[in-house]
Each structure stands twice: as C-alpha cells, then as structure tokens.
Amino acid sequence: MSHYTLGWHDQLNEYHEIGEYATDAFEAVIHAREDVPYLQAHPFSLEKIEEVK
C-alpha cells in the first residue's frame, strides 16, 4: 500500500490536497471521491495524483 497526494482547484480557484493510502493511483482516486463532497460533484476536477515515496 502506498501514500498518494491528490490535488484540485475548486470553483473559487482555491487549491486543495488530500492524502490517501491505496494500492494504486486508481484506488486513491476512488477513495478521494468517496471522502470529498466536491470531488463527488466534480469527479474530473483532479489535476494532480502523486505517489509519495
């Protein structure tokens, strides 16, 4: 399991990040969308998915 940082801009152009533990980047995105209401409403607003080593 790896740690991923995911980032996005909201409608006010404010940048946000969340950290997720997952087996791969696809699973990290799924977890982030489950955890963040904005990403549920705007699922394709993610612009950064980075594995933290």
Cite the ranges covered by each PLM segment:
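Short, mixed-charge low-complexity intrinsically disordered segments
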Residues: Y15, R33-K53
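Short aromatic-glycine-(Arg/Gly/Cys) micro-motifs in beta-strand/loop hairpins
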Residues: M1-H16
